[in-house]
Design a protein with these regions (language model features):
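Short, charged/polar surface micro-motifs in flexible loops or helix N-caps
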Residues: 36-38, 45-49, 67-71, 78, ...
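Short, conserved beta-strand element in jelly-roll/cupin
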Residues: 57-72, 76, 113
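A short, N-terminal "cap"/entry segment at the start of jelly-roll beta-barrel domains
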Residues: 1-53
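Short histidine-centered beta-strand/loop micro-motifs
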Residues: 32, 50-57, 74-75, 83-85, ...
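Double-stranded beta-helix
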Residues: 2-9, 101-126
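Short acidic-glycine-tyrosine-enriched beta hairpin
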Residues: 76-96
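Residue-level recognition of conserved beta-strand positions in structured domain cores
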Residues: 42, 74-76, 96, 104, ...
Length: 126
């Protein structure tokens, strides 16, 4: 495959590195790999992720909702949470170092643009 050939976005991850280079690699089961730059990946989520939140120390995360709807739950400075519905056609920015999670009530196709390589997860809900 040449360097300018398209790849199937449903099956691949795009890494946009801080040094200005990029590459693609096939998706693997489980969480996405972490790169020194941004990981761009597309998922169709059918259920709420099992962890109780994550945060990114390297920058803001961008969510682009392609279809469906979900709720972004962000921790607030006063110890509470803020819930924001995000729908097909919406872009939503999660600020750097903000604990957040998604609640999925219907299938939701989202493109994630995630800074890396640092990411932290809280424990499993339940």
């Amino acid at each position: 495959m040449g360097s300018h050939d398209p790849v199937g976005f449903a099956d691949n991850i795009v890494a946009l590195l801080r040094d200005g280079t990029s590459f693609t690699q096939p998706k693997q089961p489980g969480s996405s790999p972490r790169f020194d730059g941004f990981t761009v990946v597309s998922y169709v989520l059918t259920e709420t992720p099992p962890h109780d939140g994550e945060r990114h120390a390297d920058g803001d995360e961008l969510l682009l909702v392609i279809s469906g709807e979900c709720v972004a739950v962000l921790d607030t400075a006063d110890g509470g949470t803020e819930e924001t519905p995000i729908r097909a056609g919406d872009a939503f920015v999660i600020p750097k170092n903000t604990w957040h999670r998604l609640v999925i009530d219907e299938p939701c196709h989202i493109v994630f643009v995630t800074p890396g390589p640092q990411m932290e997860h809280r424990g499993l809900r339940g």
